[in-house]
Amino acid sequence: MKKLFIALSLVTFFSLESSAQWKPAGDKIKTEWAEQIDPSNVLPEYPRPIMQRNDWKNLNGLWDYAIIDKGGHIPADFEGKILVPFAVESSLSGVGKRINEKQELVYQRSFDVPSAWKGKQILLHFGAVDWKTDVWVNDVKVGSHIGGFTPFSFDITPALSARGSNRLVVKVWDPTDRGPQPRGKQVSRPEGIWYTPVTGIWQTVWLEPVSGKHIENLRITPDIDRNLLTVKAELNANCATDLVEVNVYDGNQLVAAGKSINGEAVEVAMP
């Protein structure tokens, strides 16, 4: 089976230190992949393969963490290190602690923005965080999100430091079966068929530079009966003059193409 690639354009010493700070929590059964975890290079693959950009920065790794009373202030001192993106209850997080509905989990880390990204908008992406999330950059609240399974992102450009390092803080509340959210079989007291809760960041966190006008999402629909591929590019801001171009490649060979304006989907006839 051939793999087809779609290209779109919008016209307008750490490893040693990390290993010393982290080890799996508890005496849990481990797979061969768990044995291979490197805290300085956790899940290094690009986290959004359906819409991949060349420039990005992975923020997975060791973060500071603290467990606080719900509604409490961000602490000045943190309890230790947690390996993102593993849930705080898990062994691979290096923490292995349970959190109740009267507590919140706070994360902190610093990051630098590559100088080559100057003049770009900087997006902060979360693959998934369970459940209610609040995010600050340099003490500026950049956004909130509710939901444990869906990705979300914030434009953090206005909050970034003009020079030097930036401070990222994430606060999470997850009441599990004592709240209103969908939770599957997660319960506060797991037994029988019920599961241990998953709290906090559990998918990749990353930074991405984009232009002022950019593609936010793609909706790709194949029609096998008619040999058509429909591509809907959702832009951060629509304008009638925006031109979206779709190129379909078989390896390095261009096999189909199409264009649209006015926010219309592109229908590409496939060979």
Language model features: what each stretch is:
Residues 53-54, 98-102, 221-224:
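Short, solvent-exposed beta-strand/turn "edge" segments of beta-rich domains on protein surfaces
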Residues 21-56:
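N-terminal pre-domain segments of enzymes
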Residues 66-68, 97-215, 238-240, 245, ...:
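Accessory beta-strand-rich segments of carbohydrate-active enzymes
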Residues 150-152, 263-271:
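Aromatic sugar-binding surface patches on proteins
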Residues 209-239:
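Surface beta-strand/loop "capping" patches
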Residues 1-22:
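Bacterial Sec-dependent N-terminal signal peptides
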